[in-house]
Amino acid sequence: DVSHPVMESIYNQYYQEPRYRPSTITAQRLAGGVVGKKVGEGFYTYSEGKANMPPEPKLPSVKEFPPVWVSPRASRRLELLQLLKDLGANIETGASPLPHALTLVAPLGFDVTTVAVVERLDPARTIGIERLFDDAATKRRVLATNPATRSDMRDAAHALFARDGKAVSVVRDSGGFITQ
């Protein structure tokens, strides 16, 4: 119930910059009095003052995990390699990935597609992982596919990074990860 007025204020402070334009849906819901935790509706539905979170998607079933190759340009690469080791991944250490390896990139400020092209990686096997923050400081890991990522590679990455019980979100490629 306070979000829409704040979004309108920001939009107006930036001289109606289109990228800050609030959604018309929030204006309509606010006018109708059907938005906000107090009325039980909003981004989530609420019951007894708590958000009803959607259930986590079912983890993909993976019979055999491919070896994992991490880009030398990956942000927080050493931490990522340690995480993979802790998760029991078979880490590939060659200068370039073998043809059957899952290829991991951890871009900062770039999309997965661009990184795959610049680094000349096979986009069908390339997945991005959010590494802006230390893994211990987060409740969720975020993976990003590019338009060419194979479903078996997506599923292998999802299952691998969820091995320790931490929640994993798989998103489509975009101009940057959620926290960037």
What residues fall within each predicted segment?
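N-terminal glycine-rich phosphate-binding loop for ADP-containing cofactors
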Residues: 1-180
